[in-house]
Amino acid sequence: MSPAFRTMDVEPRTKGILLEPFVHQVGGHSCVLRFNETTLCKPLVPREHQFYETLPAEMRRFTPQYKGVVSVRFEEDEDRNLCLIAYPLKGDHGPVDIVDNSDCEPKSKLLRWTNKKHHVLETEKSPKDWVRQHRKEEKMKSHKLEEEFEWLKKSEVLYYSVEKKGTVSSQLKHYNPWSMKCHQQQLQRMKENAKHRNQYKFILLENLTCRYEVPCVLDLKMGTRQHGDDASEEKAANQIRKCQQSTSAVIGVRVCGMQVYQAGTGQLMFMNKYHGRKLSVQGFKEALFQFFHNGRYLRRELLGPVLKKLTELKAVLERQESYRFYSSSLLVIYDGKEWPEVTLDSDAEDLEDLSEESADESAGAYAYKPLGASSVDVRMIDFAHTTCRLYGEDSVVHEGQDAGYIFGLQSLIDIVTEISEESGE
């Protein structure tokens, strides 16, 4: 048994949960996995974990709810396919009950990676032949993976026709190119470390898309600087170059990924970060317009709520002392499903505001409010390079507010305002 198993206590006699690719991931390089309908998980990065543990109360409504930590290892099923399986950590009794997540349990009996030798001896081939064949297969898989990633870089904008039967999530299960890329890369990394380690900590976070039938997701890389204080000279230079060659340097924000439903053609459009880096300021504005356009008309009813939330977030961040959200993203999410039009008069709008306040008071910052045509979510994600004076081990302590991030928010507010005014809103 490897040292990794001894150093991480896992609850005994607990069924593991099969982790699946999160099909609505449109950006980032960290693998995000589906734990259950309302919960996602991603590899634990100490700095990000510390951020969620010490999160200021007024920022909670602008971030996913943090739900705890699980242990993840990869195992083989009876067909020798590698799967990622989550187990509860000993003594961790967070808001997520693993035993009840039957919808995500493996459909086939799983063989533990540590029992692989026993599995090999049951085959007709000798161990040497099996190892030789296994290495050959792995080499071919690795080469195929590299080819697919190169194709993904070149195919910066993709379209996928959505069937009327079945949910969008089930249809995207084996399609979303960015989600599959991140999932395969995570498996590859864990396989390469198998001899030394097969147990990892992952954090559990709220699935922000679970309330939407056809989630439209915009991932924006925020700020004029992306590298953390601990980045190597090479990494810092690379991140500085990316900022200088994109809209990050000019307006403090760039497109990192997009998934939007176009009702006119019944297609989902995907845009990846490679395309986002190439956009000019005008191109960024056009991409934002495209995100709020369903192929038939501009979803003008979304613009007001988005502006309200962006303005509120900006005010919150202006009060945060010494925080720097380097390489953090901002998600904008709405439902691409067409709903019957509802015209709100001033009294109805006041009633809506009142219902939101009462929902917050009764159920806390993460209350799920009734959805409608204008329901839209704005959340900050990805805090692996965030720093603050609360993090005692940081060599650099910043003063004041994160001006680069706030500059990006103001640019976003200005551009959405322009789109709204030009469309006659």
UniProtKB/Swiss-Prot annotation:
Organism: Rattus norvegicus (Rat)
Family: Belongs to the inositol phosphokinase (IPK) family.
The protein's name: Inositol hexakisphosphate kinase 2
SUPFAM superfamilies, sorted: SAICAR synthase-like (SSF56104)
Chief place where the protein resides: nucleus
Name of encoding gene: Ip6k2
UniProt binding sites for substrate: 215-223, 235-242, 385
Gene Ontology BP annotations: cellular response to flavonoid; inositol phosphate biosynthetic process; inositol phosphate metabolic process; negative regulation of cell growth; phosphate ion transport; phosphatidylinositol phosphate biosynthetic process; positive regulation of apoptotic process; protein stabilization
One GO molecular-function entry: flavonoid binding
A Pfam entry, by short name: IPK
Tissue: Highly expressed in small intestine.
Catalytic activity: 1D-myo-inositol hexakisphosphate + ATP = 5-diphospho-1D-myo-inositol 1,2,3,4,6-pentakisphosphate + ADP
Highest taxon above the source species: Eukaryota
